[in-house]
C-alpha cells in the first residue's frame, strides 16, 4: 500500500499544532516538516477519526430502509470513520449464520470501518467467539434467562434503558422517566456495560454511579417533543426542562451517538400510533459537536473525547488518537456556517433538517485512503477491527 504524508493543523496530545503525519493503513510517523502528498487548505483541522457506537444500518431484508452502501456513505459524509451496527434487522442478528451474513455484507460494501453487535442469544458459547464488538440488550431481553449469561460475557454489553413494562399498553407509559432509570438496576453489578441514548440527566448520573459508560444523542437534546411520526423515537423525546438538564450532561457523558434509525418514507407517513420509531441523522453528530466548540459551550478537548477518544477506549481498539501504530483514520473539519441535510442516506427527511451548524466535514481518511472530500464520498474498503481482515 502507498505510504503518504499529510500536512496541516492537527489535534494530538491535547494540543493543536502544525504537523506532518506519515501513514499507510496505520500511522507510521509524526514530525514537524515534510514534503506532503496531501496539503490541506487553511482553516482545516485534522482530528482522530470519529466513531459512532450506535447505528442501525439495516441491510439484509431491510435494505429498502437503508443498505450498507447508503448508510456508510452517509457516515463518511458526516465525518464518521467507524460505526457500530445494531442487531435488530431482518433476520435478527444473534446466531452464527446471521452474524456471518451481516459481516459479509459489511465486508463487501462498507465505505467506513465497521463492527457489529449480536442480540441476546441462546448460543452464547459459539457467538462469543465471533468477531463482534459485544451484545445489545433490548428492554424485552431483561426478562429472558439467557440475558443473565450474556451479561457475564467479557465483551461489551449495550443496554437500551427501558424496563419491559414500558413496552406494554399505551405509548404514554414510555414518557415515565422512571421506566428508563429503573432499567439500570437490572444490570447493576455487571462489568463492561454501556448505557445508550440516555434521555435525562438522572439516567446519566446513575449510570456513572453504577460504574457504567453512557451516551446521549443529539436528537434527545434538540428535538422538541414527539409531535408526529418524524419525531417518534425510543426512548421518547423528553420535555424542554429535561432536555435543558440533559445538555448539562454533555460534560459528564462518555460519548455522543446518532442512533441512526432509518425507515422508508411510506412507513414514517403512517399514523403516529402505528408508525415505526426512529430518527435517521447519522451525518449530524460530528458537525453538531464541533458547533458546540465554535459556540464556546465545550472545549475542543472535550469534543475529541466525545467523538473519538472515549468510544475507542470503550471498545478497546487502536483508534481515537493520532499516534503511531493507530489506524490511519482522520476526520478533517472546517469551521464554517451551513444548514444540515442528509445526502447519501435513503432517508431524505429528518427533524434536524435545516439546523444551523458552524462546522462541516472537509475530508475523511479511512484506512489511509480518502473516504470523502468536500461532500463527495469514495468507495474505500472499510475493515472490522474485531475481525480477521485487519
UniProtKB/Swiss-Prot annotation:
One of its GO terms (biological process) is purine nucleobase catabolic process. Keywords: Hydrolase, Metal-binding, Pyrimidine biosynthesis, Zinc. It comes from the Archaea. GO terms for cellular component: cytoplasm. Its EC number is 3.5.2.3. Zn(2+) 1 binds at residues 54, 56, 136, 259. Substrate binds at residues 56-58, 88, 263, 277-278. InterPro entries: Amidohydro-rel, DHOase, DHOase/Allantoinase_Hydrolase, Dihydroorotase_CS, Metal-dep_hydrolase_composite, Metal_Hydrolase. Pfam families: Amidohydro_1. NCBIfam families: PRK00369.1. PANTHER family: ALLANTOINASE. This is Dihydroorotase. It comes from Saccharolobus solfataricus (strain ATCC 35092 / DSM 1617 / JCM 11322 / P2) (Sulfolobus solfataricus).
Amino acid at each position: 500500500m502507498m505510504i503518504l504524508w499529510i500536512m496541516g493543523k492537527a489535534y494530538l496530545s491535547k494540543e493543536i499544532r502544525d504537523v506532518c503525519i506519515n501513514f499507510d493503513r496505520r500511522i507510521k510517523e509524526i514530525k514537524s516538516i515534510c514534503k506532503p502528498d496531501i496539503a490541506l487548505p487553511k482553516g482545516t483541522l485534522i482530528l482522530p477519526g470519529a466513531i459512532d457506537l450506535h447505528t442501525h444500518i439495516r441491510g439484509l431484508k431491510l435494505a429498502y430502509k437503508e443498505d450498507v452502501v447508503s448508510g456508510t456513505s452517509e457516515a463518511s459524509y458526516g465525518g464518521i470513520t467507524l460505526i457500530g451496527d445494531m442487531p435488530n434487522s431482518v433476520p435478527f442478528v444473534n446466531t452464527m449464520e446471521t452474524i456471518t451474513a451481516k459481516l459479509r455484507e459489511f465486508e463487501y460494501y462498507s465505505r467506513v470501518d465497521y463492527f457489529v453487535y449480536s442480540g441476546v442469544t441462546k448460543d452464547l458459547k459459539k457467538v462469543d467467539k465471533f468477531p463482534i464488538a459485544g451484545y445489545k440488550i433490548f428492554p424485552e431481553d431483561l426478562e429472558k434467562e439467557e440475558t443473565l449469561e450474556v451479561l457475564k460475557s467479557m465483551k461489551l454489553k449495550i443496554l437500551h434503558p427501558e424496563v419491559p413494562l414500558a413496552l406494554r399498553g399505551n405509548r404514554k407509559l414510555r414518557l415515565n422517566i422512571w421506566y428508563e432509570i429503573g432499567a439500570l438496576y437490572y444490570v447493576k453489578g455487571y462489568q463492561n456495560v454501556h448505557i445508550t441514548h440516555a434521555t435525562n440527566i438522572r439516567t446519566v448520573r446513575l449510570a456513572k454511579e453504577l460504574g457504567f459508560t453512557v451516551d446521549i444523542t443529539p436528537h434527545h437534546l434538540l428535538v422538541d417533543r414527539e409531535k408526529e411520526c418524524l419525531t417518534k423515537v425510543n426512548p421518547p423525546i423528553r420535555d424542554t426542562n429535561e432536555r435543558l438538564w440533559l445538555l448539562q450532561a454533555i460534560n459528564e457523558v462518555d460519548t455522543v451517538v446518532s442512533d441512526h434509525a432509518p425507515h422508508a418514507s411510506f412507513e414514517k407517513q403512517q399514523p403516529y400510533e402505528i408508525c415505526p420509531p426512529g430518527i435517521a441523522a447519522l451525518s449530524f453528530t460530528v458537525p453538531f459537536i464541533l458547533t458546540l466548540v465554535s459556540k464556546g459551550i465545550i472545549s475542543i478537548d472535550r469534543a475529541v473525547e466525545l467523538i473519538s477518544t472515549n468510544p475507542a477506549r470503550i471498545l478497546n481498539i487502536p483508534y481515537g488518537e493520532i499516534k503511531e501504530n493507530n489506524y490511519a483514520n482522520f476526520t478533517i473539519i472546517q469551521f464554517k456556517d451551513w444548514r444540515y441535510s442528509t445526502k447519501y442516506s435513503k432517508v431524505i427527511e429528518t427533524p434536524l433538517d435545516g439546523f444551523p451548524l458552524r462546522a462541516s466535514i472537509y475530508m475523511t481518511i479511512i484506512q489511509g485512503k480518502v473516504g470523502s472530500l468536500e461532500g463527495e464520498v469514495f468507495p474505500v474498503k472499510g475493515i472490522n477491527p474485531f475481525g480477521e481482515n485487519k
